[in-house]
């Protein structure tokens, strides 16, 4: 098996800053950079799977301060804490785009962003970076887990955050 790719903290920072630095396409909504920043911040601060992030609804945030209700694999529900940077990014996006209910992340036409669209936006930002390898949403998830473990988080906590049913799945990150 190949070694898993883990982004450095400086690469993560570079990636998170890209939406605000890249000029907006003419047809893009004025709030696109805020939405994309919120998506990238949320990916890194929660370790969500791509499908979990795409499926988020505004109601998954409401009434839960700094916590997100996530429906993962096998329709298992879990609560995931959201970092303050991600929370601020989500609030800025929601306010600018006037997203008050329904899907959390929407297109200009107010449709839910698909997993393919989210993957494409990540690739677009990577083309504008000097990050030397292909980053996928799952590699952001790996980086999230590895950085938590490196900072001293215990395996069981990381298992719960990632929504793994088996500890052996989480042990891959050690």
Regions found by a protein language model. Give the residues of each.
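Conserved catalytic core of the tyrosine transesterase superfamily
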Residues: 1-174
